[in-house]
């Protein structure tokens, strides 16, 4: 009976707002706009990695608040601010992850070789990034698709087929399990330890699968959803052995980058199947167990900032070089492109495809367009695991879920 009364009162409140007001976001009271904007700057200044999305229905001093946020403190501050301003608020705003709707399964592991993530929960929506098989993610919300957050904190929507949902115990089991890491740019998992057997799926560099054992020239593996198969030993390496063998010096990183020459440009791509400019940087470093921010405009503000000398003498191989529009008195530089510096004015980048260009006008590989929009560089390799945004899979919080308990 009490629940029925609450629902009836809720209906009356909603009806009065809808009938009394058709207020859109452009017609919100100025004090509400100021409060909302100020809190967004504090709690979610970059909407790619944090959410503070509000929707108001207003009638006089009454309002219904809807929307989502990843910061409980942001919602609390908003409600306090609206209350102090004299508004009577019906709170329908959700703090993510939405534990109740997801029934406790607020974790997940990517279940496809390359998983496409979108701005909206729709295949027709713009693709914004990708995630790789075996990657742990935070599951925030369900709306036909899942809204997830990847280990670099990027937030986007993924189709249900892309992620295996898990609770905290299940993701801990996954993180603690021994794994193999795919080291070939492209390969397959087979249903039997035989290349002539039925394929289970394709795989790409950086994929991780649970290691169940070995049979002849194959590793037996398991997917997040429990499927099993076999990966050729030539295409993968046990994770612990892989970590020990990794070299993280600029020469080794550039050697990896060169193996991607000719791979086509793909907007939002972050795999050896196809990549955009920042996706190339991210893919190359991930193949050396380094996790950095997703986009060029995020990568530009981690590590050591370098103002580039006219003869490029203060650049080192492995530095990231950035391109775009220079800063003005009104705004900071607008970064739209990135490459990895090779030396002697040359850099490798993804633009059309992965190739080498030069900033030196006397070089036959001179790229006049990008030379004209060169901004600055950053040095990130020495700062891995020394800045929150720069880490590895053995220190990143997503890959550590449940691991500390067993250490």
What are these regions (language model features)?
Residues 6-16:
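Bacterial N-terminal signal peptides
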Residues 76-101, 150-184, 194, 199, ...:
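Boundary regions of SH3-family modules and the immediately adjacent low-complexity/disordered segments
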Residues 292-356, 362:
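...with weaker cross-activation on analogous glycine-rich loops/strands in unrelated enzymes
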């Amino acid at each position: 009976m009490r629940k029925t009364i609450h629902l009836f009162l809720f209906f009356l409140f909603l009806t009065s707002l809808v009938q009394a007001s058709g207020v859109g976001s452009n017609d919100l009271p100025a004090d509400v706009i100021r409060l909302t904007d100020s809190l967004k700057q504090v709690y979610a200044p970059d909407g790619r990695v944090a959410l503070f999305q509000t929707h108001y229905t207003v009638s006089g001093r009454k309002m219904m608040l809807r929307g989502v946020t990843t910061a409980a403190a942001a919602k609390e501050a908003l409600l306090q601010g609206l209350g102090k301003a004299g508004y009577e608020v019906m709170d329908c705003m959700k703090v993510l992850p939405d534990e109740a709707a997801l029934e406790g399964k607020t974790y997940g592991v990517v279940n496809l070789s390359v998983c496409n993530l979108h701005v909206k929960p729709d295949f027709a929506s713009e693709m914004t990034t990708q995630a790789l098989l075996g990657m742990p993610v935070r599951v925030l919300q369900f709306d036909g698709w899942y809204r997830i957050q990847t280990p670099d904190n990027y937030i986007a929507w993924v189709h249900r087929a892309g992620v295996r949902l898990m609770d905290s115990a299940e993701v801990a089991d996954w993180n603690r399990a021994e794994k193999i890491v795919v080291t070939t740019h492209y390969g397959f998992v087979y249903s039997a330890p035989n290349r002539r057997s039925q394929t289970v799926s394709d795989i790409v560099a950086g994929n991780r699968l649970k290691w169940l054992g070995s049979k002849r020239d194959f590793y037996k593996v398991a997917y997040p959803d429990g499927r099993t198969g076999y990966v050729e030993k030539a295409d993968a390496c046990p994770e612990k052995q892989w970590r020990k063998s990794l070299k993280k010096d600029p020469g080794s990183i550039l050697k990896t980058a060169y193996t991607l020459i000719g791979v086509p440009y793909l907007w939002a791509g972050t795999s050896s199947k196809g990549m955009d400019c920042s996706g190339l940087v991210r893919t190359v470093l991930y193949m050396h167990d380094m996790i950095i921010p997703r986009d060029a405009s995020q990568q530009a503000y981690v590590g050591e900032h370098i103002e580039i000398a006219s003869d490029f003498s203060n650049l080192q191989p492995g530095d990231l070089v950035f391109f775009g529009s220079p800063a003005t008195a009104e705004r900071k530089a607008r970064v739209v492109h990135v490459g990895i510096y090779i030396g002697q004015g040359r850099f490798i980048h993804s633009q059309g495809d992965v190739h080498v260009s030069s900033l030196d006008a006397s070089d036959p590989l001179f790229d006049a367009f990008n030379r004209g929009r060169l901004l600055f560089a950053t040095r990130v390799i020495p700062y891995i695991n020394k800045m929150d945004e720069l880490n590895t899979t053995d220190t990143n919080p997503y890959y550590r879920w449940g691991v500390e308990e067993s250490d």
